[in-house]
């Protein structure tokens, strides 16, 4: 039924201007304001895909990762994030190193992954498989 459909995801934020700056200026993504719909952004990502971000006054951050960015060199990306003032999330139940990276590959437990949040508290990851 949906084969060939160009599916997309969306999530909310409490301040659309902070989101625009964070995703555009801080993370370097192509951010498009949807002029026809105030409070709506599209992140234009690879292969013509989009991620919709919308303003929600009573926003509650998701308790799960809303966005995963595959990367070739997680150490380099984590260093860049840290240099931009982004703090990585630490989870007591996970064995993360001093940088905040879960080294899953070396433990045969999946990919290397690190998490951080956007200004609205949504969880984002960088992941090296």
Placement of each model-derived feature along the sequence:
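Short, charged/polar surface micro-motifs in flexible loops or helix N-caps
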Residues: 47-50, 59-61, 74-76
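Short hydrophobic/aromatic beta-strand element in the GNAT-like acyltransferase core
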Residues: 42, 50, 68, 113-114
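N-terminal beta-strand motif that seeds the catalytic metal site of vicinal oxygen chelate
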Residues: 1-18, 64-67, 127-129
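Helix N-cap motif at beta-to-alpha junctions
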Residues: 15-16, 71-75
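Core segments of cupin and vicinal oxygen chelate
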Residues: 4, 10-50
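Vicinal oxygen chelate
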Residues: 1-2, 69, 78-129
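Short acidic/glycine-enriched loop/turn segments that link adjacent beta-strands
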Residues: 36-40, 61, 108-110
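Short amphipathic alpha-helices within nucleic acid-binding modules
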Residues: 22, 75-80
């Amino acid at each position: 039924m949906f084969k060939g459909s160009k599916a997309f995801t969306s999530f909310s934020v409490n301040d659309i201007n902070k989101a625009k700056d964070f995703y555009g200026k801080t993370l370097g993504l192509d951010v498009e304001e949807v002029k026809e719909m105030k409070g709506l952004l599209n992140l234009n990502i690879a292969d013509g895909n989009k991620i919709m971000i919308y303003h929600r006054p009573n926003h509650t951050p998701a308790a799960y990762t809303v966005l995963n960015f595959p990367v070739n060199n997680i150490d380099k990306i984590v260093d860049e994030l840290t240099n931009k003032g982004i703090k990585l999330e630490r989870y007591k139940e996970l064995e993360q190193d001093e940088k905040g990276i879960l080294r899953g590959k070396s433990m045969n437990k999946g990919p290397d992954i690190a998490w951080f949040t956007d200004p609205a508290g949504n969880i984002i990851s960088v992941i090296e498989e």
